[in-house]
């Protein structure tokens, strides 16, 4: 049970018209934040995170350039977030995960989200690749999402902590995403 006595629907939108001057709720808009903020392009498969949130009018097509042409693929939200027992919620740390480092040197602006068609369709079939590190002559930095929803063997931490860096415990940052981007306790 949710422990609530009732639910309420938001008021309908009523555009201001001169003849409706006495009406209530004219031009009333409901504020919202788009979350998760990470998106992926369905065409080029690149991950995209805007620097300061996304407005609904900004969503739509990928603006990455390939051979001087825009990709124009459809952007969709990535369906993974992190939350803790205290109710904090934030975007999954894609850059930290793929680099296995809580403070990666790479900026994470060239991460690719790919599905392996030869696997079952579970988390182990989703791969994140850092194309920036791969271009620098390093071995490709690539990692799948296997076990990201699992607890560690001792149930005292998460798979994220166990597989990020040795001797580093990935802790909740206290994010209160519902209050705005970058709001933490």
For the regions a language model picked out, list residue spans one by one.
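Extended, Lys/Arg-rich, non-catalytic nucleic-acid recognition/anchoring regions
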Residues: 1-185
């Amino acid at each position: 049970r949710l422990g609530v006595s009732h639910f309420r629907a938001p008021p309908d939108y009523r555009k201001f018209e001169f003849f409706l001057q006495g009406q209530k709720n004219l031009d009333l808009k409901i504020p919202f934040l788009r979350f998760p903020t990470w998106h992926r392009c369905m065409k080029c498969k690149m991950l995209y995170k805007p620097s300061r949130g996304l407005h609904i009018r900004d969503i739509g097509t990928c603006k990455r350039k390939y051979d001087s042409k825009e990709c124009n693929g459809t952007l969709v939200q990535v369906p993974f977030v992190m939350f803790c027992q205290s109710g904090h919620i934030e975007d999954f740390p894609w850059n930290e995960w793929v680099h296995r480092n809580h403070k990666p040197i790479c900026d994470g602006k060239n991460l690719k989200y790919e599905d392996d068609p030869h696997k079952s369709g579970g988390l182990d079939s989703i791969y994140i690749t850092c194309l920036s590190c791969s271009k620098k002559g390093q071995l490709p930095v690539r990692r799948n999402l296997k076990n990201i929803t699992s607890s560690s063997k001792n149930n005292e931490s998460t798979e994220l902590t166990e597989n990020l860096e040795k001797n580093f415990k990935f802790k909740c940052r206290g994010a209160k995403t519902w209050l705005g981007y970058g709001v933490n306790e």
